[in-house]
Design a protein with these regions (language model features):
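Short, flexible, mixed-charge glycine/proline-rich loop motifs
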Residues: 1, 11-19
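Structured secondary-structure scaffolds
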Residues: 3-6, 19, 23-194
Length: 194
């Protein structure tokens, strides 16, 4: 599928812009067509359940404009999600295979493993039941589509709310380590004090 190394993400055709022979995301990240053996999560089977959940829980994603983005994406059709890679050997290994977990699957499951899944105590479950994810808009589909479908697949409670904010910018561009335009907080403290 279409993969952006910069974003560490796969994209569907409907998410891309074609200029000549080059495909990019709406945010300008170049994507390349990659083929490799992979395990898949049957995301396509969760489309209707996700849409029903969004209708029954209208405040699941905030602000409403972000919820509208999520619903529109899901209504457009979901494809099964690649959850492993074979083109490199670092990362969390998939048991009894030569596959490595796709980085976003690893990252999302950390929310549960950090509180002891599958043996979550009642005390820690109380935190989960009141969980609010505060995320950047660029990782909304991972948190509001892929993650809820995965949780539904294991019959686990979903986070209470996902709040997706815009980006912090520096000279009009998204601040990110990969772009090299981050602001050093220590320099700001030296300049302005605490």
């Amino acid at each position: 599928g279409w993969y952006s190394v910069k974003d560490e993400s796969y994209y569907q055709d409907k998410e891309l812009i074609k200029t000549g022979d080059v495909y990019t995301t709406k945010d300008g990240s170049q994507v390349d067509w990659i083929e490799e053996d992979s395990f898949f999560f049957k995301l396509s089977e969760w489309q209707e359940k996700l849409l029903n959940f969004y209708e029954e829980n209208p405040d699941f994603v905030m602000p409403k404009s972000r919820m509208n983005e999520v619903k529109s994406f899901v209504k457009g059709g979901l494809k099964d999600l690649s959850i492993s890679r074979t083109s490199f050997n670092w990362g969390i290994k998939v048991p009894e295979s030569d596959h490595i977990m796709y980085v976003w699957i690893d990252a999302l499951t950390n929310y549960l493993t950090s509180i002891g899944y599958p043996n979550i105590t009642d005390e820690k479950m109380e935190y989960w039941e009141n969980c609010i994810h505060i995320i950047g808009k660029d990782i909304l589909k991972f948190h509001a589509i892929y993650w809820p479908a995965m949780l539904m697949a294991i019959n686990h409670a979903l986070p209470k709310t996902i709040f997706a904010h815009g980006w912090w910018t520096n000279e009009g561009k998204k601040i990110s380590k990969s772009s090299g335009n981050t602001i050093d907080p220590n320099q700001m403290i030296d300049k302005f004090g605490l």
